[in-house]
Amino acid sequence: MERNTNPNNLPVELNRTSLYLGLLFVFVTGVLMSSYFFN
C-alpha cells in the first residue's frame, strides 16, 4: 500500500477513515474469533 504519488493531495480525513476501518476490522475479527472459539 505504498501509493505515495501525491502525498499533498491526500486529506486528513483519509487517515482517520483508514484508522476507523482498521479498528472496525479488528473488532469484527475479534467477535468472529470469539464466537468461533466459544462454539
From Swiss-Prot:
Domain of life: Bacteria
Phylogenetic lineage: Bacteria, Bacillati, Cyanobacteriota, Cyanophyceae, Synechococcales
Topology of this chain in the membrane: Single-pass membrane protein
Transmembrane region(s): 18-38
Primary localisation category: membrane
Quaternary context: PSII is composed of 1 copy each of membrane proteins PsbA, PsbB, PsbC, PsbD, PsbE, PsbF, PsbH, PsbI, PsbJ, PsbK, PsbL, PsbM, PsbT, PsbX, PsbY, PsbZ, Psb30/Ycf12, peripheral proteins PsbO, CyanoQ (PsbQ), PsbU, PsbV and a large number of cofactors. It forms dimeric complexes.
Family matches, as HAMAP family: PSII_PsbL
Subcellular location, record wording: Cellular thylakoid membrane
Functional note: One of the components of the core complex of photosystem II (PSII). PSII is a light-driven water:plastoquinone oxidoreductase that uses light energy to abstract electrons from H(2)O, generating O(2) and a proton gradient subsequently used for ATP formation. It consists of a core antenna complex that captures photons, and an electron transfer chain that converts photonic excitation into a charge separation. This subunit is found at the monomer-monomer interface and is required for correct PSII assembly and/or dimerization.
GO annotation, biological process: photosynthesis
Protein name as catalogued: Photosystem II reaction center protein L
SUPFAM superfamilies, per the entry: Photosystem II reaction center protein L, PsbL (SSF161017)
GO cellular component terms listed in the entry, alphabetical order: photosystem II reaction center; plasma membrane-derived thylakoid membrane
Family assignment from sequence similarity: Belongs to the PsbL family.
Organism, as annotated: Synechococcus sp. (strain CC9902)
Keywords of this entry: Membrane, Photosynthesis, Photosystem II, Reaction center, Thylakoid, Transmembrane, Transmembrane helix
